[in-house]
Amino acid sequence: MFRKEIKVLDCTIRDGGLINNYQFTESFVKAVYAAICDSGVDIIEMGKKLVESAEYPRTKYGEWNYCDEDVLKRVVGSYQGRSQPKIAVMFDIGRIDINGLSDKKDSVVDMIRTACYVKQIDKALDVVKRCKDKGYETTLNIMAVSAAIETEVIEALEGVANTPEVDYLYLVDSYGAFYSEQVTHYINLYKKYVPIQKMGFHGHNNIQLAYANTQQCIIDGMNLLDTTINGMGRGAGNCPTELLLGFLRNPKYEVRPIYEVIQNEFVPLRKVMEWGYNDIYGISGLLNQHPRDGMKWRSDKAKAENCHDFYEICTKAVTGD
């Protein structure tokens, strides 16, 4: 489906880093960056920009959890391709140092994406305002709306409507639980309460609908779409970059570099990292639950494939039986 307003944001490093604590080698990240440059993808998210803490020590987490300026400059300066994507990083509310953020003129970062839950909306909007004051393009990614009370979602949207510093408002299917009807429902809800806002979508593939739901977002008028190469991301992963580029039929995109980096980098990586659909993550999506329990279950080789046992435990937790 060709529509020139549509932009693709590849978040392979940021979402994929949730699998391995951002322990990607610099050569791997440079290979991903080069593929994104040559593919014509509009934006690449290089990771999270968190502060080191007892929760997130550098002894446990890799460079892409912090996205220090010198590290990003090494990657961006390593390749000049057929296009130069904008550089994005993600903020998590409560885990950042907004006072230490450089002005845009002193950074290779173009866009800061602020992720929050509905109950954190006031803090998130303050962060967005301060990022905009420093010259950055901004997105607000409201997570886990499928598990939120709709009246609270509406209240959050009313706050966004009064915050013009938000360049893009994101619908995020954090648990990979949405069906297309729910996607349309939330898009209409967002448009009702924030009618002038540009919007984006970030899907997860727990019930194997990330690609289909991204297509539904296009039909419903969203123009900024998140993807990951080979669908690599937390748990069941995300909408694959290579599939969406093919679907969009936009001549500015070239899918061959994406398949090349999959063959050279991602296929070997699959031998040591797991991502993509399986029945454990499917259960998490069907029950609209955070995938952390599924990921913990999969990490235990003795029971990793015991989907019936996992379902029994999860449904008892939901029903209270």
Where are these regions (language model features)?
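Catalytic cores and adjacent flexible loops of soluble metabolic enzymes
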Residues: 1-321
